[in-house]
Amino acid sequence: MKKIIKVEAVEKHFGNQVIIPPLSLDIKEGEFLTILGPSGCGKTTLLRMIAGFETPTKGNLLLDDERINDLPPYKRHMNLVFQHYALFPHMTVEKNICFGMKMQKVSAAEQKERAEEAMRLTQLLEFRNRKPAKLSGGQQQRVAIARAIVNNPRVLLLDEPLGALDFKLRKDLQRELKNLQRNLGITFIYVTHDQEEAMSMSDRIVVMNKGHIEQIGTPKEIYNKPKTLFVATFIGENNIVKNGEGYVAIRPENVKVRSVEEPILKEYHLGHIEDIEFVGNMEKLYVRDEKTSELLMAYQTAEEAAQWSIGDNVYVGWEQEDEVTLN
């Protein structure tokens, strides 16, 4: 897949403070790439540099192998969608979508044709004459996206666009966004702190921490093979266990809990159950390892967990192949 954007040893300083130390990243044409990390990790600053709203202190940004550091945002063939959609309250959906084209002196006929297609793709045709105050949060978000894609951008940049929505609507729109990206075939660069959001939508995820990239990979790679201690603790749940000079991560679903009446395997330790949590179709056991004093998490089905009570002595362990060594 062709690389559309290259970030080459880019740095961003604010005064004496280094927000992003040298950072490099290749973004493929047509992919859904998510930049994921906690608040203050530099993800929005990176997005704003790609968009042209911030200038790199050092390094180069390339679009189709052309340096764009000094190119203004409106010449980059990119559009940015913010969490707060900035819709014009006095304009209808259709007029909001057409506003940018009107400023660019696009003919009325072409405005109508392109707006029609954008509204069709975002399922807004029936709302074309409504004003933002008469729309739900999800509909407003779709208007913001329609307004962005109507200009046929090469890249769509999205800065936590679902952050202000309730859980159910957010889940529905995650699916809509991914389907929209597939239909459009354009590159999406999506910024979020929500790991579940990143996992459900992305082709690849860039995990950031303190201005650095910790890991780049597919959702499955990030989940199953975290490379660093930060990724292992930030993405999903992991048991982090000291192993010599370093650490290994074991997902709770790979930790086995057995009765003390069963023959013990050499990899298993004696422990006792400190707590049991109901988590939907599973139960989460918290087991204190008597040998290491580690508190381990293990998932079991409700049927499997029915045999246990808080305080029970058990054997706890896992297969070596389920350990992931961390840097």
UniProtKB/Swiss-Prot annotation:
Residues involved in ATP binding: G37, P38, S39, G40, C41, G42, K43, T44
All residue ranges annotated as the ABC transporter domain in the record: 5-235
Location in or out of the cell: Cell membrane
Family matches, as Pfam families: ABC_tran, TOBE_2
Chief location bin: membrane
Record-level Gene Ontology MF annotations: ABC-type putrescine transporter activity; ATP binding; ATP hydrolysis activity
Matching SMART domains: AAA
Domain of life of the native organism: Bacteria
GO cellular component, one term: ATP-binding cassette (ABC) transporter complex
EC number: 7.6.2.11
Swiss-Prot/TrEMBL keywords: ATP-binding, Cell membrane, Membrane, Nucleotide-binding, Translocase, Transport
Function (record text): Part of the ABC transporter complex PotABCD involved in spermidine/putrescine import. Responsible for energy coupling to the transport system.
PANTHER family registered for this protein in UniProt: SPERMIDINE/PUTRESCINE IMPORT ATP-BINDING PROTEIN POTA, SPERMIDINE_PUTRESCINE IMPORT ATP-BINDING PROTEIN POTA
Family: Belongs to the ABC transporter superfamily. Spermidine/putrescine importer (TC 3.A.1.11.1) family.
Protein name: Spermidine/putrescine import ATP-binding protein PotA
Gene (name only): potA
